[in-house]
């Protein structure tokens, strides 16, 4: 069933969204992108005359914690939807059940943070650090049993289930996956955002226009190893950049000064270089780097060879020759995946490389390439430089997107697709 086909008139819909938005010290939303992304789905249900029950998490609470209450975002959700959204001070308690039961056509109810309950994630809480294996096993068994009852209560509020939370699709949580078992195929579906995310990933994985270039940044090669190895079976060009570059440089015998490095991953870096060559993948690493004498926007800087970074200096961004090298490859590409910046883009003096990569992707997109940007830092990059609406798709899912591209089955997607 698709959301477009479904008529919500007279139906109660439990909609799992990802309203895990950043809040400042006064609990004001600093970036409402995730809320806005869910609006088309919520508006469709309202317009049909359905009754909407919104479930989400916020942060990583270890129990009921006022600072993580979804009440903080209630006024903004009401404003964006143009309706007076009701609030339940629990997600499965009497208040939630009562308000859900009394909903009328067009009304919207926001439940309190689902993660106030350990049952949402299905992980025990409150175990002491020195708990025995038996105690851990008993606690896990207890929370799994309680999770079933928790999931049943969430499902009992609604006639249908809509998952529009791609950001948590890689989690087999109560509200993201398990709840789907309580609805038949005709009464569970993706929301519009989830549909777009799934299509974007499928296009990158299965409907590839070549040349296909992946740009992987970030500070650690160890956190990207699975996705890098999966991409080596798919891409024509793999650009590795960001902090992980210096592990490759050191592995090749270069001098990296004070640059970030994973000394225990040098063999892994050499193995990736070898595998790329064996598979005929064009592996592109930076050739020059903008270095600083300290980790500061106002530090003294110079540009030097990647292989010859002075002893007391650290790599902070790619240099002009690397920018030109990356740009040439990107402009020749027809499918582009970007995950991770080229340097410390949060500092304006070291954001030039990331901006240049973003602008090259925009130019390639204008020339007909399909470009997918995903992962927290690269999304922050395109937003910072005003490029988000000039690429093909910006994913809301960090970990979920990476796991999908690694080739893993995402529980939140499998629960709907079967």
Curated annotation (Swiss-Prot):
BP terms from Gene Ontology: gluconeogenesis; glycolytic process
InterPro entries documented for this protein: Phosphoglycerate_kinase, Phosphoglycerate_kinase_N, Phosphoglycerate_kinase_sf
EC annotation from Swiss-Prot or TrEMBL: 2.7.2.3
Catalyzed chemical reaction(s): (2R)-3-phosphoglycerate + ATP = (2R)-3-phospho-glyceroyl phosphate + ADP
Pathway(s) this gene product operates in, as recorded in its UniProt entry: Carbohydrate degradation; glycolysis; pyruvate from D-glyceraldehyde 3-phosphate: step 2/5
Domain of life: Bacteria
Keyword Nucleotide-binding part of the UniProt annotation: yes
Residues engaged in binding substrate: 18-20, 34, 57-60, 115, 171
A GO CC term attached to the entry: cytosol
Location relative to the cell: Cytoplasm
Keywords: ATP-binding, Cytoplasm, Glycolysis, Kinase, Nucleotide-binding, Transferase
One term of GO molecular function: ATP binding
Positions bound to ATP: 224, 315, 346, 375-378
Subunit structure: Monomer.
Entry's family note: Belongs to the phosphoglycerate kinase family.
Name listed for the protein in its UniProt record: Phosphoglycerate kinase
